[in-house]
Structure formats: structure tokens, C-alpha cells
């Protein structure tokens, strides 16, 4: 039979190893969380640099928000970056959704001045048909760059219709739903961007 002293020693050892194991788990978890946070931060910065000039990226102060608005295509929270120059908000970069693509939702990133002038647009993800609807990708065609320097007036702005419907947006051979869906999403997103001074009381 173990002595009382041995029992106490074993209990202390078990307690020590339990504490050590728990501390190790917490330590590793904290390191992992910090690594994940850093990776996400790098991903966000990479996204922004896809749609704004390098000079603007490095010279403007950036503030990050999560925002929800039906103009962004759904009821989920979306990434928003506001860029400031001399403490004045000048540019917004927003992730949004075109919910009505031919093969499902299309995720896009839009950068625009708060007055509604578009700086850049990129498609982040989609499920469109290869060789047809996937021309929305910058790696496949320059179609998405055509939005640069366009101005959005309001949701009724007819410039953002396809040319076959009287607008200025090029369609794809054999595909009209996809480009119109993206164009509509770009327009809605910029209308949201124009609302930002009211939303944030800038």
C-alpha cells in the first residue's frame, strides 16, 4: 500500500504535469491565433493592392471595418477599408456580392472615391463556366478593368447596362447574365460607397 507521502507526491506530480500541459496548449493556441491574425492581415492588404495604385496604398492611412448593407448583395458582414488623406476620408475599398451570377454568387472587390468615381474592380471568387463566364477574371481577360474611371450616379444609372440593352458594358459571346450581374453589383457597391459619409458622419 502506498504511503500517504507517496500519494501526496504523485498528486503533486500529476498536478504539475496537468498545469504544464494546459500552459503548453494555451501557449501554442496564442501563437497560432497570432499567426492566423497576421496571415489574415496580409491577405487583406494584398486584396486592397489589387484595386488601388501602389502610391495610394502607401501614402493613405487605412482603417478597417466590417459592414452590413443590402446594397452589398446579401445580409452578411463585408470587409470595408476607408483610406484617409490629411485626416479626410477619400477612398473606400469594399467586398461585395453579385448574388445572381449564371452559376451562383460572384464575390467582387470594388475601390472608388467617395464621390462615385471607380478606381478599380476585381473578381475574388466565382463558379462561372470556363471559357464563357470566367472572362470576368483579370487573369483571363481585361473586361473587369473597363469599370475603371467610370462614375456611378445612382441605382438607375443606365451606363452599367450591357450595350445590347443601351448601356456601355461589353457582354461576352454566349454570356449576358454573368457580365450584367457583375456590372449591377459594381454599381450597387459604388452607390453604397457614396453613402459612406452619411453612415460614418464624415
UniProtKB/Swiss-Prot annotation:
Question: Which compartments is it annotated to reside in?
Answer: Cell inner membrane
What GO biological process terms does the UniProt entry carry, in alphabetical order? electron transport chain
Q: What does this protein do?
A: Part of a membrane-bound complex that couples electron transfer with translocation of ions across the membrane.
Q: Which domain of life is it from?
A: Bacteria
Positions bearing FMN phosphoryl threonine: 176
- EC number, as in UniProt: 7.-.-.-
Identify the species of origin: Buchnera aphidicola subsp. Schizaphis graminum (strain Sg)
Q: Which family does it belong to?
A: Belongs to the RnfG family.
The protein here is known as Ion-translocating oxidoreductase complex subunit G
